[in-house]
């Protein structure tokens, strides 16, 4: 992939190399009563790592609860229930937080917003992405803007970004 210009032909889904994202603990994350729960009976996890996991779970569960999200126990992903019969909601989720996982969020930006961020640059992105000012996506504003500007993503469509809020990095992105 050309780092200077990521187009539809070059990018279906991209993974960004990142340090420890805590993804190795995904198998121990369960869903109980619409909350993410860490279930590992072995003592092979350091107390510091366990504390980090529990902090993330607490923050994520609070976000899920406060925003009336529903966690799918099979996918371990929280989303809002959207009644698809309403034609006004067909484009729901193109801008904002599309999905919440225990240690990351998927942030969506529509074509217009990607174009605005690309032209405004990283410094101007904070204003354009102000809708993410709270919750687990808040720290993702600069990270997402950095990927858009650094990779010079084309604006033929919207993009999604996976933001790991433990490492505060974008770990993947692709077209909406």
Residue ranges and their predicted role:
Residues 1-8, 125, 129:
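Short intrinsically disordered, low-complexity coil segments enriched in acidic
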Residues 3-103:
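N-terminal propeptides/leader regions of secreted preproproteins
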Residues 47, 112-120, 135, 139:
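Soluble non-cytosolic domains of exported or imported proteins
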Residues 5-6, 138-150:
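Canonical hydrophobic alpha-helical transmembrane segment
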Residues 33-36, 44, 71, 110, ...:
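Amphipathic alpha-helical interaction segments
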Residues 124-142:
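Short hydrophobic membrane-inserting alpha-helices and related fusion/pore-forming segments
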